[in-house]
Structures are given as structure tokens and as C-alpha cells.
Amino acid sequence: MGRSLKKGPFVAGHLMEKIEKLNAQGSKQVIKTWSRASTIIPDMVGHTIAVHNGKQHVPVYVSEQMVGHKLGEFAPTRTFRGHAKSDKKAGRK
């Protein structure tokens, strides 16, 4: 079940303030954020937002196709290093 249309999309207040400030200035600089739950809105298009993945900030360039998704979707928190290899020599007798 999605969020109510009456409420509108969730965007962290501090992140929204930074976006509005940069849009007013017309500058494009990297914005660091820990708010992975914030929804990408049209005002964010063209900005680079560094989203925290638990270890570091991953730079995410926001395009029009990303509008409506969450910031956390574009900064994976887990790294897949492959399945464990089986030791076939130990099984022989």
C-alpha cells in the first residue's frame, strides 16, 4: 500500500531546504544525505546527491526517470562477493 496522496511524498526537511537553496542560486553541488527514505521529486532532477549506504556516501545523479523512487534504491547497502566455493578435494577418500 502506497502513501496517501493527501500527504504527498516524504522528503526530509533538511534535504528539501538544501535543494531549494541550490535551485534558487542555480548551482549544482553534491549534497550529502543520510535520508535514504526520502522520495525523489522533480525539484531534485539534475542534482547529484551523495546517499549514505552505511559505510560511505554513494553519489547519485538524479534523472527524470528516478522521480517517484526513493534515494536508498540507488545506493546498495550490501556487496555480493559470490557464493561459497565447495572444496571437492576434501570429499575424496
UniProtKB/Swiss-Prot annotation:
Classification via Pfam families: Ribosomal_S19
GO biological process: ribosomal small subunit assembly; translation
Domain of life, per lineage: Bacteria
Keywords: Ribonucleoprotein, Ribosomal protein, RNA-binding, rRNA-binding
GO cellular component annotations of the record: cytoplasm; small ribosomal subunit
GO molecular function, one term: rRNA binding
Signal peptide as annotated in the record: none
Function: Protein S19 forms a complex with S13 that binds strongly to the 16S ribosomal RNA.
Family membership noted in the UniProt record: Belongs to the universal ribosomal protein uS19 family.
Name of this protein: Small ribosomal subunit protein uS19
